[in-house]
Amino acid sequence: MRILVTNDDGIHAPGLATLEEIARELSDDVWVVAPESDQSGVSHSLSLNDPLRLRQVSEQRFAVKGTPSDCVILGVRHILGDHGPDLVLSGVNRGQNVAEDVTYSGTIAAAMEGTILGIRSIALSQAYGAGGRGALKWDCARTHGAKVVRKILETGIEPGILVNVNFPDCEPADVQGVAVAAQGFRNQALLSIDARVDGRGNPYFWLAFAKARFEPGHGSDLKAIAEKRISVTPLRLDLTDEPTLTRFAQAFAE
């Protein structure tokens, strides 16, 4: 099995090294094509107005001056060419990608791009807690990752579907199992704007998530990681809401 590994945190990210370890438990044919720099939050953007710069880091490892989606396209269509990957793994992201995070995430977008190209694709993320990004428990993803991916592949991924996996903020031995969970929803009041002024008196802003408490919905990915379970959430490319489609069709037919 040929595996293409990518991420949105960049070629030097510790989560990428973790995912390479996971991939090598599954196959000895692993290729890495990742962004040259951190591309967190770029979602499914493509570099249409800038050239893509490709740098070979080592054998079967490449860095791209571009987005995660650029990396998947370049990896599949140029680097691997006629012998494309059987699986795209994206991550391991530095921080959870749950609830509406999936709409912003470059990690999810890379898996989405793989799915568009007809390749089985899985996004993996490691949650962090009060200790922040500097205290991520990568061993959680490292220990459980290959087993979860293997089970997903054995179960099967239908065309048009990608799978989002999140590992909880705990030691590997403290994981309370796997939860197949729906995408959750946060209160967007948790998104804060930090207004500042630079040395020349000009305003600038940072977007951040406020550290406020909220109650995650039952059966959601948010609830799963809060309970120290690994969340597995199938996502689909088709964003059509069928009930609303039917309701609108009836309304406009009148």
Swiss-Prot record:
Known cofactor(s): a divalent metal cation
EC number of the protein = 3.1.3.5
- Reactions accelerated catalytically: a ribonucleoside 5'-phosphate + H2O = a ribonucleoside + phosphate
Where, by residue number, does a divalent metal cation bind? Answer: 8-9, 40, 93
| Gene3D superfamilies, per the entry | Survival protein SurE-like phosphatase/nucleotidase (3.40.1210.10)
Sorted alphabetically, the keyword list is: Cytoplasm, Hydrolase, Metal-binding, Nucleotide-binding
Q: Which cysteines in this chain are paired by disulphide bridges?
A: none
Q: What subcellular locations does the record give?
A: Cytoplasm
A GO cellular-component term linked to this record: cytoplasm
* InterPro entries in alphabetical order: SurE, SurE-like_Pase/nucleotidase, SurE-like_sf
Lineage: superkingdom: Bacteria
Top-level EC class: hydrolase
* Known role: Nucleotidase that shows phosphatase activity on nucleoside 5'-monophosphates.
HAMAP family attached here? SurE
Q: Which family does it belong to?
A: Belongs to the SurE nucleotidase family.
Write the protein's name: 5'-nucleotidase SurE
From what organism does this protein derive?
Methylobacterium radiotolerans (strain ATCC 27329 / DSM 1819 / JCM 2831 / NBRC 15690 / NCIMB 10815 / 0-1)
